[in-house]
Swiss-Prot record:
Residues binding [4Fe-4S] cluster, per UniProt: C297, C300, C343, E350
Gene it is expressed from: ispG
Gene Ontology MF term list: 4 iron, 4 sulfur cluster binding; 4-hydroxy-3-methylbut-2-en-1-yl diphosphate synthase activity (ferredoxin); 4-hydroxy-3-methylbut-2-enyl-diphosphate synthase activity (flavodoxin); iron ion binding
Catalytic activity line of the entry: (2E)-4-hydroxy-3-methylbut-2-enyl diphosphate + oxidized [flavodoxin] + H2O + 2 H(+) = 2-C-methyl-D-erythritol 2,4-cyclic diphosphate + reduced [flavodoxin]
InterPro entries linked: Dihydropteroate_synth-like_sf, IspG_bac, IspG_bac-typ, NO2/SO3_Rdtase_4Fe4S_sf
PANTHER family found in the cross-reference section: 4-HYDROXY-3-METHYLBUT-2-EN-1-YL DIPHOSPHATE SYNTHASE, 4-HYDROXY-3-METHYLBUT-2-EN-1-YL DIPHOSPHATE SYNTHASE (FERREDOXIN), CHLOROPLASTIC
Record-stated family: Belongs to the IspG family.
UniProt entry keywords in alphabetical sequence: 4Fe-4S, Iron, Iron-sulfur, Isoprene biosynthesis, Metal-binding, Oxidoreductase
Cofactor note: Binds 1 [4Fe-4S] cluster.
Organism this protein belongs to: Francisella tularensis subsp. tularensis (strain SCHU S4 / Schu 4)
Protein name: 4-hydroxy-3-methylbut-2-en-1-yl diphosphate synthase (flavodoxin)
Highest taxon above the source species: Bacteria
A biological-process GO annotation: terpenoid biosynthetic process
Pathway in which this enzyme or protein is active: Isoprenoid biosynthesis; isopentenyl diphosphate biosynthesis via DXP pathway; isopentenyl diphosphate from 1-deoxy-D-xylulose 5-phosphate: step 5/6
Catalytic class of the enzyme: oxidoreductase
Length: 405
């Protein structure tokens, strides 16, 4: 991992620290109608259980603002104290003023400089939110999106650019406008009295190369904690790959303190998918460990049986299910490496390199499956119960290696 290009401030959001030398934080956002307390609480609990360390909720009208304190109370009944971020557009100043209990209950406010107010009202309405944040000792994310960019600012920069001897391209102007909007807003917030360690900024776009270019420049120009993410990543494989590529490159360069993957969920798909992708990005970069990793081969002509795929799925599902209790009982188990391989070519080698691994027989190979523990052959499995026996061996390994001595 690359070193941080600039040392960022540390921002406390509820019980979570963002920035500085702290681990990159995983965020998510609900898609429920916030005023529906029951559904919103249910989704927040699911997101938090999946590993989201901060959850953002839409606060777009009076019903939503009035529901926020009740949502926090209901979460507490489930022993869930995940910080909630209020997502405000257009009317945040009004809602936070009219519903002071909402302002108190939220752990952070998100403001979009592009729609916090227009014309002469912009600075006034922005200032109202900042003053409420100061009064309640709350941090603020100044989140700029290129889909809702401040048009007055953009027009100003275009006019200035047109007067230059060597004008920038329209794309470069867009990048400059995003960064300028964020930094000018952050500077104004500080002038109003909001401390630097209460400010997080983001400049979100939808294209990978644009995101990389904007954040590389942004990281050089400021010391604020940075929130990373494509503003709309898309659905399925496209959204996952675009997010992994863009966030992976920036994080590897040491840019970014908290991330969200804005996937479009497939119909009836769980909202928690975006959390899983965030965690996989961080774990595969070696920045954090959340759950034991499973190395498995893709299969080839040597592995005509589907059994190794079935076993891989069973092992992964078992590990994911058990981690909710294991992480409390067995310190360090999240770093465990498991291998499930399908033939003799790479099977023994990968299994030896894992903490615990199994090499299943490929086509035409002897119908036995050696199990390796800490690099040494420990068992040989055969017959119809290989799956159950291997999972039992994994269970015993966890207890023996990670249990309290």
């Amino acid at each position: 991992m690359g070193s941080y290009m600039n040392k960022t401030s540390v921002v406390k959001v509820g019980n979570v620290l963002i920035g500085g030398d702290n681990p990159v934080v995983v965020q998510s956002m609900t898609d429920t109608y916030t005023a529906d307390v029951e559904k919103t609480v249910k989704q927040i609990l699911a997101l938090h259980k999946a590993g989201s360390e901060i959850v953002r909720i839409t606060v777009n009208d009076e019903s939503a603002a009035a529901a926020v304190p009740e949502i926090v109370k209901e979460l507490a009944k489930h022993d869930c104290h995940v910080p909630l971020v209020g997502d405000f557009h257009y009317n945040g100043h009004t809602l936070l003023s009219k519903y002071p209990e909402c302002a108190k209950a939220l752990a952070k406010y998100r403001i979009n400089p592009g729609n916090v107010g227009f014309g002469k009202k912009k600075d006034t309405q922005f200032a109202e939110i900042i003053k409420i944040a100061i009064a309640n000792d709350k941090p603020v994310r100044i989140g700029v999106n290129w889909g809702s960019l401040d048009q007055a600012l953009l027009a100003r920069l275009i006019d200035e650019n047109n007067a230059q001897e060597n004008p920038l391209s329209l794309q470069q102007i867009m990048h400059k406008a995003l960064i300028t909007s964020a930094l000018e807003s952050a500077k104004y917030a500080e002038e109003l009295g909001l401390a630097k360690d209460k400010i997080i900024i983001s400049c979100k776009v939808s294209e990978v190369q644009d995101l990389i270019a904007v954040y590389q420049k942004l990281a050089k120009e400021c010391g604020y904690a940075l929130h990373l993410g494509l503003t709309e990543a898309g659905m399925g494989t496209k959204g996952i790959v675009a997010s992994a590529v863009s966030l992976g490159i920036l994080l590897q360069q040491g840019i970014g303190n908290t991330i969200r993957v804005s996937l479009t969920p497939a119909p009836n798909a769980p909202r928690t998918e975006e959390v899983r992708v965030c965690r996989e990005i961080l774990q595969n970069l070696g920045m954090r460990t959340f759950t034991p990793s499973v190395t498995s081969c893709p299969g080839c002509g040597r592995t005509t049986s589907s059994f190794f795929r079935e076993l891989t799925s069973k092992v992964k599902d078992h590990l994911d299910e058990k981690m909710h209790t294991w992480k409390e009982q067995y310190h360090g188990v999240e770093a465990m490496k498991v291998a499930v391989m399908g033939c003799v070519v790479n099977g023994p080698g990968e299994s030896k390199n894992a903490d615990i691994g199994i090499s299943l027989p490929g086509s035409g190979e002897s119908p036995v499956a050696p199990v390796f523990i800490d690099g040494k052959k420990a068992h040989t499995l055969r017959g119809d119960n290989i799956s159950e026996e291997f999972i039992e061996i994994v269970e015993n390994y966890v207890k023996n290696r990670y249990g309290k001595k």
